[in-house]
Every structure is written in C-alpha cells, then in structure tokens.
Amino acid sequence: MKRSSGILMAVSSLPSPYGIGTLGKAAYDFADFLKDAGQSYWQMLPLGPTSYGDSPYQSFSAYAGNPYYIDPDMLAADGLLTAAECAAPDWGRDPRHVDYGKIYENRFTLLHKAYKRGWERDAEAVAAFAQDNARWLPDYALYMACKRHFGMKSWTEWPDDDLRLRKNEAVLDKYRTLLREDVQFFTYLQFLFFRQWTALRDYVHQQGIRIIGDLPIYVAMDSADVWAEPQFFQLDDDLVPKAVAGVPPDYFTADGQLWGNPLYDWDAMRDDGFGWWIRRIDGAGKLYDVIRIDHFRGFANYWAVPYGQPTAKNGRWIAGPGMDLIERLNGWFPQLEFIAEDLGYPTPEVAQLLRESGWPGMKVLEFAFDSRDSSGYLPHAYTPHCICYTGTHDNSPLALWRQEAAPEDVAHAVEYLALTEQEGFHWGIIRGGMSSVAELFVAQVQDYLGLGEGNRMNIPGTQGGNWTWRLLPGELSDALSTRIDRMTALYGRKA
C-alpha cells in the first residue's frame, strides 16, 4: 500500500429515513465526503444478513448481502415501490440508533411488495444473477425459506431430520417446491442488494476511493454455510459441534469470550485444497478491494472450547492451517490485498505467521497508552508495513476513551502526543496516527466528530445495544472535510 488514509464507517451507520443505513444517497454522499477529505479508503463492517443480536460478525451467510441495506428510495425510482409505501412503516424514533426490532418487523413486508412487482419483470436479469452465483445462492435462498417456515429457528432445531441432515436431494426438492415463493423472494432480495451494491462500488471507485471489507474468520452455526457443507466443520455424526470458538481470559475479560461459532475441520479443508476458503475469498473479492481478516491469529492457532461449556475458560490452543492456507490465498488472489487483524495475545507463532504472510498487521492507538499492556502500539515502534487505527468498532470513540481510561493512561497520551485543549484531544490523537510511518491510517468517523458517550459501536462480550450507532444527517460538514483534507495532505497521505 502507498501512504494513505481512510475512514471506518459501517453501512448500517449511514443516515437514512428508513431506520438503518442503506446503499442509497447517503452512501454516495459519504463517498463524496471521502474524496473531499483527501481520503483513499472506505472501511466497512461485514455486509452479510444479521441474525439474533444484530452482529455483522454472526451472519446467516458468508456470501449474501444484508437485505436491510437495500435502499427503498432506489426501489421507488425503479418503479418497485411508492414513496408512500416507503414512508408508511415505523422505522424507529431515534435517528442516532437503529431499532432492529422495528426494522425486522417492517422491512421484509416492504421488500415483499418490491418482489411481487419485480420478479417477473426482472426474470432474465435475475436468472443471469442466479447463474453467476450458483455456488451459494440456491442453498442460501432455500435456507432462509426453511428458517421462515420453521419460525426462524436455526437449522439445528428443524423438526425434519432429513432436511436438517440434508439426507438426499429428494428432501431438498420437496422443500424447494413447498416453499417456492419464499425461495424466489430471498433470491430476488440478493439480486436487488447486489445490483445496488455494484452501482455504489463503481461510484466509489470513480471517486478514487477503494473499499476495505471485513471478513469474520468464523461463520455462524445458524448459517447456510454450515448447513450446506457440514463436512468442513468440527461436528459429530448428528452435526452437533464438538467444540466452539472463543478467546481465553485476559486483562479485560476474566472468563474470556465464548463466541460459539463452529470450528473448521482444517484437515478436511486441506484435503480439499482449501476450496471452501478460495470460494469465500473469491466472493469477498467481488465486493471489496482490500480484505481485513478478522482474528488472524486463528490461522496460527485457535482457542477451542468444548461444546456446552458456560464460559471460554476451559478451552485449549490448537494449531491452525498456517502458511498452507495463506500461500493458497496469496497465489489464487494476487490482485487482492489483505490486512491481518492481529490484535491481542501476541505470540512468536502469530508474529512469524504475519511476517511470512506478507500482510500488514494492525496497530491501535488507544492500546498504545494502556499501562497494563501497550504491546508495541506506540507510533515510534511502528514499521511502515502496518495499518494504524485510532480504534476499531470494538473500541470506545476517542472522546469516550478519554473519560474511561485510567488517569495515568490519559496523561501518557497527553505527554507523548503533546495534546492540548486548543487543538482538541481527539484531533491530537488523530494527528499521532496521521504522522506515523504506518502505510495506512484509519479513524472511526466518530473520532473525527469528537463524539463520546452513547456513540460506541460495540462492546465485546456484552448483549444488547450494540451495532446500533448511526450518523445524523448533516454531521459531515464541508468544514470537517476541509480540516481532514488539510491534515491528510500535511502528513503525505492525500489521495
């Protein structure tokens, strides 16, 4: 990567009159803002359909797009909806936070109207789209139709064992016929999502901006991916997990974090030439220009927690695929760039794998001043081949970090970066990242706005209230883009 910078902004966080960010006008406006601010990258969170808990890291599919992001206004412009139909539902009353309950209640009803009007009209284009995505789309559409049929339960709870275990093609054909209308509906939603996404991506590229996507290392148990290809996961004969993913206890979490995702059967994947991963990265490469691999350390070794344990305490480290997988990915996708999310638990094995991969790792400025464990995140310790962040979606915005951090940590930041009230605490830390030798610097949009309490995206290990933060209309001003542009140019990062 050449010296550059970008902004982290989830699609869900874009302003919208429809309760959640979409691929519509606000997304195009944000691309314009990035250009005006001299930025080179738009970093996003995963784009997949969210399930219970609303986390983009727990999706029903590793390939599908989130139907919530389909923009109603664009559907209206295409003759699939009316403006009155788009405005009628209650999309939530708080413009700062997504009300996922309201979205779930009303979005699919609205989108079903678009489906009824567009399915036959767009038949030829939908057929071409389905053919291009034949490797994953039929399983996903059938999976979602079956979930709806069985009260949105995970496939592990479906009462028909033949369907749950995918005993034969006949049982799948039975449900394809029984649930034909819903299979078509979920197919059409993906057609709409990817049509809008492709148009937005092309516009973003026209502005000289590249897109950094986020790829969760694990997929959800409640997903079409595990249901369709259970042979690639550590499951028993009844398709119950033998062990699940998590991370061990650390300074921040006494019990560790029990994620609950099924673990990969790396031997089975290796025997298949890592075809599952090649297909997954190929899908992501059609969305993004750069792919951030979440929890990179899981490629070196991963924390396996016996299934049924109440916490992640009693897990153990098991060797991952290492360079066997990474060499395959680098060889298959020479045009793609990868970022390794290598935060936490620094070990010689992870450091060696990062070096051998050739991928840049991550540095988080908020961690740099933590008196418990700075882990080499201070800018003077950087080498150029890394990505510097003010914080990630899992961190407090800088203004909130200032309130929450230990006084000695804040004092360290003030002394190290010569922070002043005149410049602004958050601007001084942004300056520290911008001026560092890191090839790429990325800040959360909340940090540029100086937002504090109530503006955090996610608190790991907690339930409820996460993934809801939204930008308000008009918050991204011309004055702000001018100030960002000036700092970006000053430190040699301007696009």
Residue ranges and their predicted role:
Residues 1-82:
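Trp/Phe/Arg-rich N-terminal binding region typifying the photolyase-homology
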Residues 10, 54-194, 219-442, 446-453, ...:
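Alpha-amylase-like alpha-glycosidases and glucanotransferases acting on alpha-linked glucans and related
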Residues 25-32, 195-203, 277-279, 425-429:
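Short alpha-helical segments and helix-capping/turn motifs at coil-helix boundaries
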Residues 35, 197-205, 330, 354-355:
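Surface-exposed amphipathic alpha-helices with a cationic face
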Residues 42-46, 204, 210-216, 284-298:
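Short acidic catalytic loops
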Residues 49, 216, 447:
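Short, glycine/serine-rich, charged loops/turns that create anion-binding
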Residues 186-219:
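Conserved, well-ordered alpha-helix/loop/beta-strand core segments that scaffold catalytic motifs
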Residues 474-495:
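Terminal-tail/helix-coil boundary detector
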